Every structure is written in C-alpha cells, then in structure tokens.
C-alpha cells in the first residue's frame, strides 16, 4: 500500500481556476467603505416605500393559516416546552407506535409533530405547501431530512473508522494532528447535543454519491420553484470526514504559526486583518527554525505573490499554501507545544487520495448544477473540528462561481469566538480578488460538542452580541457593494428587528434582494410571513421524507423548542391570541386568501 504526501494541488485544482494569490494589481483595488462607490449596483429607480412590519399583528401574521393549523402549532409548541415530556419523548414514541400500529402512528404524527415540522414524504407531495407559502411571500429551501437509524454504538464505530487514516487504524503511525482534530470516542456520535441539523455518517463512496444525487434533486427543485431559489448542502455528506479533520488541522497550524511570528515581531493582540508581518524578519525566523532554506524562502516571497510593500498579512500568508504546491509536499512547521518540526500535510494512501478527489468532484458537480439552474448554494456549518476545512473549501468555490453574483454562501457560526475575525477576513479577500461575498449568519447548532480549549462564547447574550456585530459589518459592506448578499438565519425577533432597523438606516431596500431571512418550517411564522408579505425575501427550511425516517429530525425539533429557541413562549402567546380573536369574531373557518 503506497503512501503519498498529499499536496494542495488536489484541493485547489478541482475547486478553482487559478491559484490563490494576492497579486499587486488585486491589492490596489480600493476597499469598500464609507464614501466608496457601489460596485456594479443596480440603476437607481424610484422604489416603493417599505411597508412597516408588525410582528405582533396576529391577524396579518397568520392570515396564511387555517384555524386548525394554528391549534396544531399551539399544541405542538406547548408539548415541546414540557421538560418532563421531552425527557421521555423517545420512549413515548416507541410506545405509541407499539400500541397504535404503523398506519395509525403515521396518521397521528402527520396530524401533530410531523405535520408541524415536515412538509411531506417526497418532492411531489410537498409541492402544494411550497406553492402556498410562496403565494404569501415565503420561499423554500428544501432539505431531505432522512437520517440513518444508527444506534449510538454504531454511530461511534462508524465515526471512529471514517475519521482515522489507514495508518492510524492499522496502528502503524501516531497521529500528528492536534487534539481537536483527532478522532475521540467521546464525540463519536455527532448527533449528541445537536438540535437543528441533520447528521451524516460516512458509510461508503456509493453512499456519498447517493447524497450528492439527493442534493442535486433539491437544487433542481429549488430552481423550478422560483427565480431566486436557495439550496443547502453539508460537506460531511460528500466524503470521509478524515479529510476535513486533516485539512482543518493543517489550516489551523498554518494560521497559528503566523500569530506566533506576529508575537515575535511585537504585533500580538492586533485585529487579524490589521496584523502585518515584516517579510525580512519573517524570512530570518523561518530559516532559523529550519523550516526551509534561504533559497527556498526567497522563492516564496516575491513581488508577484505578495506585492512590493515588504509586509504580508494573514490573507497573504494563507495564500502561500496554494502557490507553493511543490514545496508544500515537504513543508514543516514547529509544533508550538513540543517545539519539534512536524509535517504540515499528512500522508494519504492512494485509495485515500482517490476518495479525497471524489469528494472535491462532488462539490464541483453541485456548484455547477446550482450555477446552471440559477440557485444560490449555501454550505452549512458543522462541528468546530471540521469548520476550518469546510470554510476554506467553500471559499475556493466562491472564487470560482461568485464572479458575477453571490452564488455560493459560506456559513458563519456566531457562537464561535473568532466569528467576527473570520467575517472580516472573507469580506476583505472578496474585495481584493473581485468576487461576490455571500454569507449566512447563524448562532450555531453545535454548542455542546467541544471538549478542548473552549472556542465558543460563554453565554447566549455574548453570542447575540457577536451575531449583531458580524451582521452590522456585513450590512455596512452591502451598502457600498451591491454584489454582496447575506442570509440572516435567525428565529430571534430582536435580531430581525435589528436587521430591519439597520437596513432602513443604510438605505438597503428589500427589492435589492441583498438581505435574506431564513427560519425553519413550523417555527416563527409570526416573523416569516409578515416579512414576506411586506416584500422582504424570506425563506423556510423545508424538510421532507417518510415519517419513520425523519423521526431523528423531529426529535431535535422538539428539543430545540424546549431550550434554544427563546421566542417559543411569545410564539405560543400570539397563536393563542389569534385563535381567541377568530373565535370572538366568528372567523374560525378562515380561509387563506
């Protein structure tokens, strides 16, 4: 079994047209900011005034819903708020299935939890709901919600095998990856603590191809449903998670080395985008550490790759991984904990290289299909130990496909401490290289899955502050760059109000379709539908699939309503208020129109 040192070529060749570099011409482009001219913005035309949005007007908020649907929502959300019920919900579901039989159990679920949170069993059966929501200004993001029914033990075993290299599994090598990028049994079942996302486990290359086909069907359906559709994918569905772990480890070490050298040059504590290293001093440090020879170093740092300023920032530094393909095969960096030099890139077998290539090809197929049918493709965020790789691979797709409009959207998890720095760096890179920035901002669904130095904010309030800070920065960018766009994926009413206020202050009109809103089906209709009816682009994540196969998804919906979604109590109050209003006005048989 031959071993190869993987090179960046495998990642870059399939994901982009040209090497990541920061040539002088690109650096001379003026950064967007106050006073800058909009980039390729739409012609100024008279636009209608933006209607006021009232989330407390239940008659308008729920005019798309029949009374029995409101009663179901009130019942389901109230049950989800019961800690005693939630603690035993799996046992209760099992008991109900045993007592009622499969057919009656399916009927009960469709009348309650399934009907609330899932659109239907297949793309044909969900079409009426999609068309109904669109008539009231709400689009759909299709999400095939089926998960494999694995026991915790099976999930743990599958994850441990798919996150380890052949050498590690055979006991022939010791992992050089840092702790957070190694496989740990304690986190083997990635479903634990995840409240709002479908989880994929690697089974085989054929299974990954099947996941790709499912994503392709969703992209095609979204393209046919509207002229401004969205679709979402997860990279863990497309290949072995081992590659994401190893790539994340490499990127993290490379970035950490940059900050180590910055500290040596007395520049610790500066914002990531403002930290600039003196190239001459950096060259001396690299030679002293034995990372490369002086001749190799001189070949690294040239005017062609870094400009003529004599300094380089974190974006320049990360670009060196791309442009130094041959040297990266032998690249080593010092382990800041042991002091020893270690290979930056891990060893792959020939079979592992083929699997990695197939993963990147699947990403490429999906991006091309989205581009072909005009659907925006959102790459969902996942666990922190996968996220550096996911973000970087998404960025490579953005370089290639976001040339004319923001087609590929990266996801930023604002519960992470470095979320704001990551947003700033990606916006700056898009400015330099001239592609369209696209982002989805979320608070985060993986807060319980850490186990090392805590990368998350300490409280929900701290996360909300970071979310608003990131959102405000992106909205400022949108004001000066008409080719950028953002999806505000939040159930938090205060966050949505904050967005609307800042849009008004910055002159961002909903007709420009730069700011999108997203919520889950069955949750926060009092936010989604008033926005849609007022002309704001808003979307529901619409899961679908057979009843029994989406039960894991439904379990997490129930858990989310109990804790994460703080607005559930207000939503129940509004539902009850509207039912009482209809009862008092004799309009219980209200028909949406």
From Swiss-Prot:
Keywords: Acetylation, FAD, Flavoprotein, Mitochondrion, Oxidoreductase, Proline metabolism, Transit peptide. Its main location: mitochondrion. This is Proline dehydrogenase 1, mitochondrial. It catalyses: L-proline + a quinone = (S)-1-pyrroline-5-carboxylate + a quinol + H(+). The keyword Oxidoreductase applies. Its cofactor is FAD. Converts proline to delta-1-pyrroline-5-carboxylate. Pathway: Amino-acid degradation; L-proline degradation into L-glutamate; L-glutamate from L-proline: step 1/2. The keyword Lipid metabolism does not apply. It comes from the Eukaryota. The modification N6-acetyllysine is found at residues 368, 479. Residues 24-44 are annotated as: Disordered. GO terms for biological process: proline catabolic process to glutamate. Gene3D superfamilies: 3.20.20.220.
């Amino acid at each position: 079994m031959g071993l190869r040192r993987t090179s960046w070529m495998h990642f870059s060749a399939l994901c982009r047209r040209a090497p990541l570099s920061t040539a002088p011409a690109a650096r001379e482009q003026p950064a967007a900011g106050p006073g800058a001219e909009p980039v390729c913005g739409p012609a100024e035309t008279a636009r209608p005034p933006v209607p006021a949005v009232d989330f407390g007007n239940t008659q308008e908020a729920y005019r798309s819903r029949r009374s029995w649907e409101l009663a179901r929502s009130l019942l389901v959300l109230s049950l989800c708020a019961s800690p005693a019920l939630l603690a035993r919900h799996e046992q209760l579901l099992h008991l109900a299935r045993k007592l009622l039989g499969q057919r009656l159990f399916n009927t009960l679920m469709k009348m309650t939890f399934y009907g609330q949170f899932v659109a239907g069993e297949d793309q044909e059966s969900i079409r009426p709901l999609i068309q109904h929501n669109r008539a009231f200004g709400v689009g759909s993001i299709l999400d095939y919600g089926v998960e494999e029914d694995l026991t915790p033990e099976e999930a743990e075993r599958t994850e441990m095998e798919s996150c380890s290299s052949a050498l590690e599994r055979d006991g022939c090598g010791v992992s050089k990856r840092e702790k957070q990028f190694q496989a740990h049994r304690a986190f083997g079942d990635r479903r634990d603590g995840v409240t709002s996302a479908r989880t994929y486990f690697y089974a085989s290359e054929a299974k990954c191809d099947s996941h790709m086909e499912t994503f392709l069907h969703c992209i095609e359906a979204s393209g046919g449903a509207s002229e401004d559709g969205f679709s979402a994918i997860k990279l863990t569905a497309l290949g072995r998670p081992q590659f994401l772990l190893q790539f994340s480890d490499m990127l993290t070490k490379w970035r950490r080395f940059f900050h180590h050298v910055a500290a040596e040059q007395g520049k610790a504590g500066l914002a990531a985008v403002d930290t600039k290293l003196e190239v001459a001093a950096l060259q001396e440090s690299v030679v002293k550490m034995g990372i490369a020879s002086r001749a190799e170093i001189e070949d690294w740092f040239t005017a062609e790759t870094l400009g003529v300023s004599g300094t380089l920032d974190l974006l320049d530094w990360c670009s060196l991984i791309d442009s130094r393909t041959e040297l990266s095969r032998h690249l080593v960096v010092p382990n800041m904990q042991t002091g020893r030099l270690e290979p930056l890139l891990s060893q792959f077998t020939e079979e592992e290289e083929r699997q990695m290539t197939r993963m990147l090809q699947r990403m490429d197929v999906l991006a091309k299909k989205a581009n072909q049918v005009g659907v925006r493709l959102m790459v969902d965020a996942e666990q922190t130990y996968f996220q550096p790789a996911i973000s970087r691979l998404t960025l490579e797709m953005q370089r290639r496909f976001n040339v004319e409009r923001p087609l590929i959207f990266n996801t930023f998890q604002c519960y992470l401490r470095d979320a704001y720095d990551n947003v700033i760096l990606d916006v700056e890179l898009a400015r330099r290289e001239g592609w369209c920035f696209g982002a989805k901002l979320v608070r985060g669904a993986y807060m319980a899955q850490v186990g090392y130095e805590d990368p998350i904010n300490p409280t929900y309030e701290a996360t909300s502050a970071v979310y608003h800070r990131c959102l405000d920065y992106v909205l400022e960018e949108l004001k000066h760059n008409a080719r950028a766009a953002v999806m505000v994926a939040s159930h938090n009413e205060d966050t949505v109000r904050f967005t609307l206020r800042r849009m008004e202050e910055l002159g961002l009109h909903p007709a420009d379709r730069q700011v999108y809103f997203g919520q889950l089906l069955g949750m926060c209709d009092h936010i989604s539908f008033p926005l849609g009816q007022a002309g704001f682009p808003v979307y529901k994540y619409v899961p679908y699939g057979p009843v029994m196969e989406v039960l894991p998804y439904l379990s997490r919906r129930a858990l989310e309503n109990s804790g994460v979604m703080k607005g559930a109590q207000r939503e129940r109050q509004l539902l009850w208020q509207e039912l009482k209003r209809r009862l008092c006005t004799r309009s219980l048989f209200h028909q949406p129109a």
